[in-house]
């Protein structure tokens, strides 16, 4: 028999942890499907400078979030959610070979980046960044490169040129390779190689998860309303999987809103 919860949260980044804390504060029985701490992009961030009241490394921040999650009373399910199925008045969630039931589901999936450049994953948090406004000040007065052609990328180039000594902008697709020692030192673009201190990669990345049939999405991510409700009643979404901006404060706030909305949904059903 499937184990049943009031609310099941898929994802244990800041949006998922925020949602779990808020659901537990409302007295709900909660489970969180969590990947390893080390696999989270937050864990690899060099420094967190854009979250109010905190200034610490991504690893320290991620570990504090994990500690809060471990102590909040939610059940932690290690693994990867494979599907979310409607069971009428509830949802079934497959995680590996196990099956769980919940009255409501919160998707806090983050984003999945595909077609990584050589060196991109290796140097993430050590000179590779996906957010110029988050990490740009770490490279004040230094030489950086930005890969991207979107309107957001153009704005980021303008921002970086105000604080960096030199900004190399690569708007056209080509073969890129990032290399260095402990940190980024070089970017190879085509046949040319450039000495840089950081590489900002601005992609239109979205979650590629297709967990639930009928879940409406656009090019930015899962479509939600102001209550973080998706197109499927009882399924809510929060954080990077709902689209830009990819910011910690946004993810935390959306996690809280999704949790309160899910709790209200459960209460109205009388689950």
Regions found by a protein language model. Name each.
Residues 5-60, 68, 142-172:
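Beta1-alpha1 glycine-rich phosphate/pyrophosphate-binding loop at the start
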Residues 11, 108-110, 147, 200-203, ...:
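Short, well-ordered coil/turn residues at beta-beta hairpins
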Residues 16, 83, 112-113, 152-153, ...:
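Glycine-rich nucleotide phosphate-binding loop and flanking beta-alpha elements
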Residues 40, 115-116, 154-155, 209-210, ...:
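Glycine/Thr-rich phosphate-binding loops of Rossmann-like dinucleotide-binding domains
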Residues 1-8, 26, 75-142, 186-189, ...:
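FAD-binding core/adjacent interface of flavoenzyme oxidoreductases
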Residues 63-64, 69-88, 92-94, 100-102, ...:
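A Rossmann-like FAD-binding core segment of flavoenzymes
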Residues 25, 122-138, 202-249, 254-260, ...:
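FAD-site-proximal beta/loop scaffold in flavoenzymes
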